[in-house]
């Protein structure tokens, strides 16, 4: 009886402890749920956005382990022994000489002629030894690169040999002063328009105004250009020497397009040069095997950017990528040009002979045409790729396209980087599967698989419970036996078929 009384007296204390435990559980649940609601309400996201607003992001997270990042190349240091070019506006384009020269060339579209028909200082290029444009170079510092640039512009880019509207100054010390009359030619200056169209294909956007879409309004032998769209039709193209400092941002792409221009008009098939000679450079510049690293001068931001052998293997397998072309140019610059820095003529000749085997001319010309057609194109400067933050693996970098003078936003090619992220996952899973297959014996894997299949089948059969004989109510279950055609036990225990309820 005393125990019962003691138990009843302890009930309030037990209830008090239960209430305390319940309060603790409720408090923990409220705190956890409160933090969850606080994280989902967007307050922390707003504070993070306000802190990071106005700052540039080098990468964008795609999921918990993949991010979208990029690398930007400094092409001006890649080919410092070649002419670099840039466009200041729709009427002025500049070429500057290599790093060891001081000359520059200015290409200007204008409607004002600087050549006086009665002046004796100007001569027709067609009368200068079959149109030898090198006779127009009177800069006195000469140089093989300048003569090559003038000849390439005149013969291979402009596709004119004895253009009747081309004149230049031939006075000693007069510098370079060449004028092309774009209005001379049949049917309203078609020669001039072809000349400008070819030059615009090399220079690219914003040179769409150089082409000038106009209609011929011909009456008899007189033709006038009317309804010009997309730009003004200029009358003269003037090439003259100038200084090149601080005009605009220079790039060698126009020179590369110029070197490929002859190939674009040729029907001779060619084959890209084969494999890379990549090696990995450490922080001290020593070469170690295992991949390829871009040196600090080759990229815009400070530091060393490395790509593993998987990316380089993709370039060896597929040549139809702008990034692979750029890597070939870097490799060419490091392994060939560095031995010819003192001989500009030899290095230039080597570049002309090997450029067609280094990069895909179809990609370069295709991007040039996209540039003229106002379609997003590749300028071979900025490339995006997917980076795995855990393993450090990269996808094959893709060109970050340019439109209207600026790079596209990430959302404009979202499908592309999502697809690359998925492909990177697939490659990682495939590699893990191959490694696992290499470490595990194939016979053991087969035994494990078929044993699992056997176990699954037996579980299914056990659940079904296939009947083997009838049970007659009131009698014991017979031993295992066969069943006759009358569904009776073959053991003879049941001799007559009874009309009873069967179980």
Curated annotation (Swiss-Prot):
Chain positions recorded as Zn(2+) 2 binding sites: 469, 471, 477
Sites where the protein binds Zn(2+) 1: 57, 481, 489, 491
Glycan attachment points: 89, 111, 181, 241, 379, 387, 404, 409
Site (Important for GP-C-mediated membrane fusion): 33
Site (Cleavage) location in chain: 58-59, 273-274
Lipidated residues (N-myristoyl glycine): 2
Gene3D superfamilies: 6.10.140.1590, Arenavirus glycoprotein, zinc binding domain
Disulfide bonds listed in the record: 86-248, 293-306, 315-324, 378-399
Membrane side Cytoplasmic: residue ranges: 34-58, 468-503
Example GO molecular function: metal ion binding
InterPro entries assigned: Arena_glycoprot, Arena_glycoprot_zinc-bd
Transmembrane segments: 18-33, 447-467
Gene Ontology BP, a term: virion attachment to host cell
Keyword presence, Lipoprotein: yes
Extracellular-facing ranges: 2-17, 59-446
UniProt keyword terms in alphabetical order: Disulfide bond, Fusion of virus membrane with host endosomal membrane, Fusion of virus membrane with host membrane, Glycoprotein, Host cell membrane, Host endoplasmic reticulum, Host Golgi apparatus, Host membrane, Host-virus interaction, Lipoprotein, Membrane, Metal-binding, Myristate, Transmembrane, Transmembrane helix, Viral attachment to host cell, Viral envelope protein, Viral penetration into host cytoplasm, Virion, Virus endocytosis by host, Virus entry into host cell, Zinc
GO cellular component, one term: host cell Golgi membrane
Membership in a protein family: Belongs to the arenaviridae GPC protein family.
Protein name (Swiss-Prot/TrEMBL): Pre-glycoprotein polyprotein GP complex
Taxonomic lineage of the native organism: Viruses, Riboviria, Orthornavirae, Negarnaviricota, Polyploviricotina
């Amino acid at each position: 009886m005393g125990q019962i009384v003691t138990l009843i007296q302890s009930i309030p204390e037990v209830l008090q402890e239960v209430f305390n435990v319940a309060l603790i559980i409720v408090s923990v649940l409220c705190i956890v749920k409160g933090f969850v609601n606080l994280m989902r309400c967007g307050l922390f996201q707003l504070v993070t956005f306000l802190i990071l607003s106005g700052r540039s992001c080098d990468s964008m997270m795609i999921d918990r382990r993949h991010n979208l990042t990029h690398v930007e190349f400094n092409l001006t240091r890649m080919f410092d022994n070649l002419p670099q070019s840039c466009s200041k506006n729709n009427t002025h384009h500049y070429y500057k000489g290599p790093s060891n020269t001081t000359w520059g060339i200015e290409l200007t579209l204008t409607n004002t002629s600087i050549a006086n028909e009665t002046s004796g200082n100007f001569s027709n290029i067609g009368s200068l030894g079959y149109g030898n444009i090198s006779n127009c170079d009177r800069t006195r510092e000469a140089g093989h690169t300048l003569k090559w640039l003038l000849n390439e512009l005149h013969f291979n880019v402009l596709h004119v040999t004895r253009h009747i509207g081309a004149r230049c100054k031939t006075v000693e010390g007069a510098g370079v002063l060449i004028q092309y009359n774009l209005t001379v030619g049949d049917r309203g200056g078609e020669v001039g328009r072809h000349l400008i169209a070819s030059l615009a294909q090399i220079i690219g956007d914003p040179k769409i105004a150089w082409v000038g879409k106009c209609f011929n309004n011909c009456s008899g032998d007189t033709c006038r250009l009317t309804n010009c769209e997309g730009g003004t039709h200029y009358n003269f193209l003037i090439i003259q020497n100038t200084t090149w400092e601080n005009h605009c941002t220079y790039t060698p792409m126009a020179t590369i397009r110029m070197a490929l221009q002859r190939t674009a008009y040729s029907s001779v098939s060619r084959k890209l040069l084969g494999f890379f000679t990549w090696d990995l450079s450490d922080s001290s510049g020593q070469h170690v095997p295992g991949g390829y690293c871009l040196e600090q001068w080759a990229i815009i931001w400070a530091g060393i950017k490395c790509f593993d052998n998987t990316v380089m293997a993709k370039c060896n397998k597929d040549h139809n990528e702008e990034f692979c072309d750029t890597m070939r140019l870097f490799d060419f610059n490091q392994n060939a040009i560095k031995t010819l820095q003192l001989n500009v003529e030899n290095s230039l000749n080597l570049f002309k002979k090997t450029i067609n085997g280094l990069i895909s001319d179809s990609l370069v010309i295709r991007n040039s045409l996209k540039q003229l057609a106002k379609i997003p194109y590749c300028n071979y400067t900025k490339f995006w790729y997917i980076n795995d933050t855990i393993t450090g693996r990269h996808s094959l970098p893709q060109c970050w396209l340019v439109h209207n003078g600026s790079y596209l936003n990430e959302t404009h090619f979202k499908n592309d980087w999502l697809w690359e992220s998925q492909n990177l996952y697939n490659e990682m899973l495939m590699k893990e599967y191959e490694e696992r297959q290499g470490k595990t014996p194939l016979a053991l894997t087969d035994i494990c698989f078929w044993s699992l299949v056997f176990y699954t089948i037996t579980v299914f059969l056990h659940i079904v419970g296939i009947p083997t004989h009838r049970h007659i109510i009131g009698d014991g279950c017979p031993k295992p036996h066969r069943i006759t055609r009358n569904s009776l036990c073959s053991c003879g225990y049941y001799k007559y078929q009874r009309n009873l309820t069967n179980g």
